[in-house]
Curated annotation (Swiss-Prot):
Disease in which the protein is involved: Neurodevelopmental disorder with short stature, prominent forehead, and feeding difficulties: An autosomal recessive disorder characterized by distinct craniofacial features, multisystem dysfunction, profound neurodevelopmental delays, and neonatal death.
Modified residues (Phosphoserine): S171
Pathway the protein takes part in: Protein modification; peptidyl-diphthamide biosynthesis
Name assigned to this protein: Diphthine methyl ester synthase
Keyword field: Disease variant, Intellectual disability, Methyltransferase, Phosphoprotein, S-adenosyl-L-methionine, Transferase
Gene name tied to this protein: DPH5
InterPro entries, per the entry: 4pyrrol_Mease, 4pyrrol_Methylase_sf, 4pyrrole_Mease_sub1, 4pyrrole_Mease_sub2, Dphthn_synthase
Catalytic activity: 2-[(3S)-amino-3-carboxypropyl]-L-histidyl-[translation elongation factor 2] + 4 S-adenosyl-L-methionine = diphthine methyl ester-[translation elongation factor 2] + 4 S-adenosyl-L-homocysteine + 3 H(+)
Similarity comment text for this entry: Belongs to the diphthine synthase family.
Keyword Cell cycle recorded: no
GO molecular function: diphthine methyl ester synthase activity
Length: 285
């Protein structure tokens, strides 16, 4: 059987009891290592689980999934995912491949950023469509996701922005030349995401469009949600460009046009301090 097991968001101990029992009895255990990361390394997981883990990168999961599924019809294979197993469409593809091969599967869920984001005080049922913000390059600067942000705000819904992760990526030159040389990992920060959003706002103004978001739109930056050192900051989009949230992973929320008083009271707990150089009181937004 194929087991897809969520690891939660914090450290090795966030796995469920059920998930841990399965991991310890499986013949092979894979750790998916490209859609998200934990605050601890592979070695810490191996020590706590009492099992050796095989790191599965994007290439192996998306192009060589048969290796993961090998013998899963006659033995138990575990596929570990940070957060919840269905936080990425890649994992649905793995289930479909297993089904076509006649391999049974079972999912053991866990917390993901999609539900843990409620820690900031914004009500989960008031979130609209989630968007992804990717690293811009000199030749690729996508803005199309901003239409979804606009639609969410028109409907009074908050937008969760998932920020880009680059793990085991190749430069264009190395890719063209077929060299297996990889770039250092990169994780988008709230600062970088906010700066790109502000540039989109300026581009829309230049085109004569009315942007759905401005420099003063209330946003929430989150870092390492679920970890002991998680950090949350609430302030304007402009403030998000300079607020220090520390190490990855980061996420950004663009609030909807309508905020419930209880949501606002909760956000005030995370307001960027008045004495900060980039501060502005939430109550003044």
């Amino acid at each position: 059987m194929l087991y897809l097991i969520g690891l939660g968001l914090g450290d090795a101990k966030d796995i469920t009891v059920k998930g841990l029992e399965v991991v310890r009895r499986c013949s092979r255990v894979y750790l998916e290592a490209y859609t998200s990361v934990l605050t601890v390394g592979k070695e810490a997981l191996e020590e706590f689980y009492g099992r050796k883990l095989v790191v599965a990168d994007r290439e192996e999961v998306e192009q060589e999934a048969d290796n993961i599924l090998k013998d899963a019809d006659i033995s138990d294979v575990a596929f570990l995912v940070v957060g919840d197993p269905f936080g990425a469409t890649t994992h649905s593809d793995l289930v479909l491949r297993a089904t076509k091969l006649g391999i049974p599967y079972r999912v053991i869920h866990n917390a993901s950023i999609m539900n843990a984001v409620g820690c900031c005080g914004l009500q989960l049922y008031k979130f609209g469509e989630t968007v992804s913000i990717v690293f811009w390059t000199d030749t690729w600067r996508p803005e199309s996701f901003f239409d979804k942000v606009k639609k969410n705000r028109q409907n009074g819904m908050h937008t969760l922005c998932l920020l880009d992760i680059k793990v085991k990526e190749q430069s264009l030159e190395n890719l063209i030349k077929g060299r297996k040389i990889y770039e250092p990992p990169r994780y988008m920060s709230v600062n970088q995401a906010a700066q790109q959003l502000l540039e989109i706002v300026q581009n829309q103004r230049i085109r004569g469009e009315e942007p759905a978001v401005t420099e003063e739109t209330l946003c929430v930056g989150l870092a390492r949600v679920g970890a002991d050192d998680q950090k949350i900051a609430a302030g304007t989009l402009r403030q998000m460009c300079t607020v220090d949230l520390g190490e990855p992973l980061h996420s950004l929320i663009i609030t909807g046009g309508s905020i419930h008083p209880m949501e606002m009271e909760m956000l005030s707990l995370f307001s960027i301090p008045e004495n900060s150089s980039e501060s502005q009181s939430i109550n003044g937004l």
